[in-house]
Structures are given as structure tokens and as C-alpha cells.
A protein has these predicted regions:
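Extended, highly charged clamp/arch subdomains and adjacent linkers
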Residues: 1-139, 158, 181-185
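A glycine-rich phosphate-binding loop feature that marks nucleotide/adenosyl-phosphate handling sites
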Residues: 2-8, 143-147, 201-206, 227-234, ...
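Structured, non-catalytic alpha/beta "coupling" segments that mediate domain-domain communication
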Residues: 51-62, 73, 77-80, 84-98, ...
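Conserved, well-folded catalytic cores of nucleic-acid-processing
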Residues: 60, 72-76, 93, 129-133, ...
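Phosphate- and other anionic-substrate recognition elements at nucleic-acid/protein interfaces
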Residues: 118-130, 136-140, 148-151, 155-296
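Long, highly charged, low-complexity intrinsically disordered interaction regions
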Residues: 243-341, 360-387, 429-455, 464-468, ...
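Single-stranded RNA-binding regions, centering on S1/OB-family and related RNA-binding modules
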Residues: 371-372, 376-540
Length: 540
């Protein structure tokens, strides 16, 4: 088996009389590659082509070598009358039974490894996408593009609440440019819109051109950004969306979702099946159970890493907080509906919303902003409040000083080892407390690159070889990365063009959401595609 694995080739052929209309599998019509060197994405592509009936797939290797090997093992006397029968039996049993079994095993192992790799890539991309920095303190206008049915507009405030809904018809067949322009400008003036979020679906580029022209006549500075709307339509038609906006059409809910994706990606994306978000590679070709487990873990990890505002968090995001059950989430929302808000973390246990055990597990991930206790807005666990108070008192500070320059300076000058003994706390917990006191409102997403805002349109015809551009990494796959440079289709940077040093996988250098400087390597106008390089002055 090992010998076959190390010395065989995967050979693919296009089946006769089969139509591959879009030529998806063109590179595999007459293709061969050593099994041991075959990349995961090619294994999964070949598997899909075979499953769809386009490709025939086989393993080719020296079977005569295998027969000879087995003959030497099994035939002790070449001159025996039985030798010929044994040789025939070896060939027959290998062709009918042993060979196909070994080949299936090898392909199964290849597939399993490739699926694990695809799931790992998807999980990493998803985590980086979920941790996209939120667009804080901005009034946002969401735009769900369309032709015949019109573009749906939704205004949301700083907290994500929907303020207004409109429909405009700037494109075919109505072409009501002036009427649509007036509606957009009126919304900008009325709500002091800062940013317009445009979905990247049908009519996206036409809508971008329309908005770029409109904002030139706005009375205030307005930018726009193209937002990945993958999965937005799924959410908009879901039970959850209907419960939240029962009187709105699907497309209107979609416009709200697009705006919220820009404002707080994590809170909005948790409402959608992770597989619909579109940052994976061959996710439909892997075992669903394994994929779901990996993605659920990533979502839970991301939510708990960021934390939630207990007074605004939806049930969709609360369900990922460690320790919370469906029943406890219902109690939290019921309390908010009856009393308006929580004023402290303690109210969760004082009102018997959470048991002592669940409270201990979950409370460190839940925040109360503008509450009665300033520590409730930090990631400090209530069980460490007494030690935190001692620390503050020992340096002459109090809760009112959280995040101030004076407190930061004093905390920078303390001896960690000495203070851990003085207030009887381990060094790691003390360091976490100090970091939280320095930045009580810290959001780990702020460490990531901010989305690129635009004010004008870029067309593929504008691109020239060697041109320097700024782009956002939208997807990372085994063979490279797709980068949004502001044209209709994302540009592709091949793994060989990412860096001038050797890397095994693009994820060693790039992550979804990264803002990168890239260079146009080649433009394919007929296909609407662009090849990019991250290597300056790349002459390869």
C-alpha cells in the first residue's frame, strides 16, 4: 500500500459525450499528478468532477512490479506445477479484489486529509472574518442592489436600530436616476449618514457607480464600501428575521442586514449559517458534521473573545456565550423586556436569572455598559473585583479613573511580582486585570485592519500592469488568496506571488480582512479577471 501511494499517479480524463458548459474542470480533462504531491484543493476538485460525472479518475502505477513482488513472497518453487496457477491467482485476485481495495483506501486517505485541510482553512478564514473591526459611532445607510424590483435602502443608527426604509429604481428598466438620487440625498441630510454599505450581489457595480456620483453632491462628507452579502438573503427569509421585522419584505430586511454587517459584523454574522458566509474552499465537499463542529467552535471562540453587551445582545449571539442555556437566554431577554436594562452583572444572579454555576462560567464574557459598577464593563470576572479594588486603592486610584492616562502610568510602574504577592493573586490574572483597567472598553477586533472606505469607482479597464493598489483579503485558499481591489471580481494572488520566500500555505502570510498593498500582475479583460502580486517590482 505504501509503495503504491509513493509511486502512483492520479490520472483524470474527461468522459466522452459529457458537456462541461462552463469548463469548470478544463484543467483536469487530461491530467496526471503524483499522488504524494497532490494538493488538497486539487483532490477535492477532482472528487467533485468525478461525482458530477464529468471526469473519470484512476490510479496508475506499475502493477507488474506488484505482481512480481507477490510472486516472490508466495511462490517458493518456480518449477512447481502449481506455480502457473498461483501466478494466475495473484493477478486475478489483485485485479478484482486487492487492487481496487487498496486504491479506494489510498483515495479515501487523500480525501480525508484534504477535507481536514479545507475545514481548517474555512475555520481560520471564518474567525478572521468574524473579527472584522466594527464601524463604531457611524450612521449607516444599507443598500441591497437590484434591477427590476429596485434597490432597497435601510438607515440604521449607532446601535443598529432601523430608522427608515426606502426603495429606489436607478437601474434598468425604470432608470429613475434623478428621483433615486433625491431620495438618497434626502436620507443623507435627514439622518447625517456617514457611510453607505452596498451589497455585492446583482447590480452591485451599477449601484456603486450610482452612489459614487450621488455622494459628490451631498452636503456632508460621505463614503461608501462594498459589503459581502453572502448569506444575507438566507437570513432575511429566516424565522429569526421575520420575528425581528415582521412587517418588512425580504429585500428590506436584507438591506438592514447589509448595514449591520458593516456596523458590527460579529453580531450580524452569528445569525447566519456559517457555511453560507462564503469564506471557505470546497466546503460543500467535506463531511457536514465535521465542518459544523469546527465552525461552531470558531464562532463560540470569537464571541467569547470579544464579549457581549448584556443589554443589547441578541439571542443569536448569547447562545454562543459559554455556559448559557436556551432557558437562561430567554430569562435574560424577558428581564430586559420588563425592566428595560440591567444596571449591574449582579442582577443576573440576584433575580435568579442564572444559577451560581452558570453565572461563574459566563459572566466574564458579558458586559454592562454605563451600569452602577464601572468594572462591569470590563472583562474582569466579579470574583476578582475585591482584588481589583485592593490594587486600585494601593496606588491611590478608584473606579472613576479607569482608562485614564494617570492610571495607565501608575499601572505601568508597578512591580507585577510584588503586587501579585501583596494582593494574593496569580501573575496571569493580575496582568489581565491591569490590561482591563488600562483599556476598560477594549475590543480585540480593534487590533485588526479597518475596512477601506471609498469615494469613487475603479474599473478593470483602468488597471495597468505594475499598478499599485490597496485591497482587502476576502478569501484565503490553498493556491492563493482573493483580494477585493474595488472592481467587479476579486483579484487572485497566486501563492507564488505572495512573498519572495517559500511558504507552504497562503495563511502563513495572509488572513481574511487584511488590508494589503498589491500590484497588478496581469489583466484578462475578456474574462474580467485580474492576477495580482504582493511582491514589489515582481519580474517573475
Amino acid at each position: 500500500r505504501n509503495d503504491i501511494y509513493n509511486n502512483s499517479k492520479i490520472v483524470t480524463k474527461k468522459k466522452k459525450n459529457v458537456v462541461d458548459e462552463k469548463k469548470v474542470y478544463e484543467m483536469y480533462y487530461d491530467y496526471s499528478e503524483d499522488v504524494k504531491y497532490m494538493k488538497p484543493h486539487r483532490v477535492l476538485a477532482v472528487n467533485r468532477g468525478e461525482k458530477e460525472g464529468v471526469l473519470s479518475v484512476s490510479l496508475e502505477y506499475n502493477k507488474e512490479y506488484i505482481y512480481n513482488y507477490l510472486e516472490k513472497k508466495l511462490i517458493k518453487d518456480e518449477n512447481s506445477e502449481c506455480a502457473t496457477y498461483v501466478k494466475d491467482a495473484i493477478v486475478d485476485s489483485y485485479k478484482r479484489l486487492i487492487g481496487p481495495s487498496v486504491e479506494r483506501e489510498i483515495r479515501s486517505e487523500l480525501t480525508e486529509k484534504s477535507e481536514e485541510g479545507a475545514i481548517e482553512v474555512f475555520a481560520k478564514n471564518l474567525e478572521n472574518y468574524l473579527l472584522t473591526p466594527p464601524m463604531k459611532d457611524k450612521m449607516i445607510l444599507g443598500l441591497d442592489p437590484a434591477y427590476r424590483t429596485g434597490c432597497k435602502l435601510a438607515v440604521i443608527d449607532y446601535t443598529g436600530q432601523m430608522l427608515d426604509i426606502k426603495v429606489i429604481y436607478p437601474h434598468e428598466p425604470k432608470n429613475d436616476f434623478e428621483g433615486s438620487k433625491k431620495i438618497v440625498l434626502d436620507l443623507i441630510d435627514k439622518y447625517n449618514i456617514d457611510v453607505i454599505a452596498i451589497g455585492n450581489g446583482t447590480a452591485s457595480r451599477e449601484s456603486e457607480t450610482f452612489i459614487a456620483n450621488v455622494i459628490k453632491d451631498a452636503k456632508r462628507s460621505v463614503s461608501y464600501i462594498i459589503v459581502n452579502e453572502a448569506g444575507a438573503s438566507v437570513y432575511s427569509a429566516s424565522k429569526l428575521a421575520i420575528e425581528e421585522f415582521p412587517n418588512l419584505h425580504v429585500e428590506e430586511r436584507s438591506a438592514i442586514s447589509i448595514a449591520r454587517r458593516l456596523q458590527d459584523p460579529l453580531s450580524e454574522l452569528v445569525k447566519i449559517d456559517s457555511k453560507s458566509i462564503g469564506v471557505g474552499q470546497y466546503q460543500h465537499d467535506v463531511k457536514e458534521k465535521n465542518l459544523n463542529e469546527a465552525l461552531d467552535f470558531v464562532v463560540s471562540k470569537s464571541v467569547n473573545n470579544v464579549g457581549v453587551n448584556i443589554n443589547t445582545a441578541s439571542a443569536s449571539i448569547l447562545k454562543y456565550i459559554s455556559g448559557l442555556t436556551k432557558k437562561s437566554i430567554e430569562k435574560i431577554i424577558d428581564f430586559r423586556n420588563k425592566h428595560g436594562r440591567f444596571n449591574s452583572r449582579n442582577e443576573l444572579i440576584d433575580n435568579k436569572i442564572l444559577s451560581a454555576k452558570v453565572y461563574e462560567q459566563s459572566i466574564g464574557f458579558m458586559r454592562v455598559l454605563d451600569g452602577s459598577n464601572p468594572l462591569d464593563k470590563t472583562s474582569i470576572h466579579p470574583e476578582s473585583y475585591d482584588k481589583t479594588t485592593k490594587l486600585l486603592e494601593s496606588i491611590g486610584m478608584n473606579y472613576d479613573s479607569l482608562g485614564t492616562e494617570e492610571l495607565v502610568k501608575k499601572l505601568d510602574n508597578i512591580d507585577i511580582d510584588d503586587y501579585s504577592k501583596k494582593i494574593d493573586i496569580d501573575i496571569y490574572t493580575l496582568e489581565d486585570i491591569i490590561n482591563s483597567l488600562k483599556k476598560p472598553n477594549r475590543d480585540p477586533r480593534d487590533d485588526f485592519d479597518k475596512p477601506i472606505l471609498k469615494s469613487d469607482v475603479l474599473h478593470i479597464e483602468d488597471l495597468k500592469k505594475g499598478m499599485e493598489l490597496e485591497g482587502t483579503v476576502r478569501n484565503v485558499v490553498d493556491f492563493g488568496a482573493f483580494i477585493d481591489i474595488g472592481i467587479k471580481n476579486d483579484g487572485l494572488v497566486h501563492i507564488s506571488k505572495i512573498t519572495d520566500r517559500y511558504i507552504k500555505h497562503p495563511s502563513e502570510v495572509l488572513s481574511v480582512g487584511d488590508i494589503v498593498t498589491c500590484y497588478v500582475d496581469e489583466v484578462f479583460l475578456d474574462k474580467g479577471k485580474v492576477a495580482l502580486s504582493l511582491i514589489k517590482n515582481d519580474e517573475k
